[in-house]
């Protein structure tokens, strides 16, 4: 690995916040809709975006992949989508959880919350909770929409409806502010979703990315591809001095030297910036 490529890895990690901001803007480009109380419904809405971003957000450019996946599973006509499944596989094999670290709007939202000054807590002793997101994926995203249906065979998008805080943050709240009809229809479900959102906000201030670590089914899907994704993190054993700085700065609780392709790694690049010997870098297709 030549010095130019190592420098590029450090530069990429260094401007991660700007990349996250740009990705969030591109994912929600129709900003004037926030002031009109309506949702963009153009042709681009048939295309999924990489990160967790609610379809009902007034500014949303495309569809949320988790929402689209549930819509198909809960349909009375179709129970499988080659498009959405292929979308997951393509992005998973190409980028893995780099999407979580760089391209997801809700991931960036949590990063910003965690920057709020105050006492912070480690999640190292809470590692078993990381398996909760796989249970949520299986139960709320797949099984319930598939098996719990109404009289015409349609299932609800259970994760979006009962759990996802992004929906109330990006969709319900901004739409209700400018639409009296929506405000009058808000009830117990809205209150429940607001409670979840507030809980995630508070936890995000105290802990690093609790939603990503413990709840997000999209992160669970992408994590399955981390070991085989074309974009990954490489640790050069010949240069590593075993100082452990990479693992100390990893907020996803990954032992970087031993498991650089760990399912929890979001490719944020903190380890790349911390390494005193430039032994860690991004690698694409083995180069």
For each predicted feature, which ranges?
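Non-ligating segments of multi-cofactor redox enzymes
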Residues: 1-257, 263-287
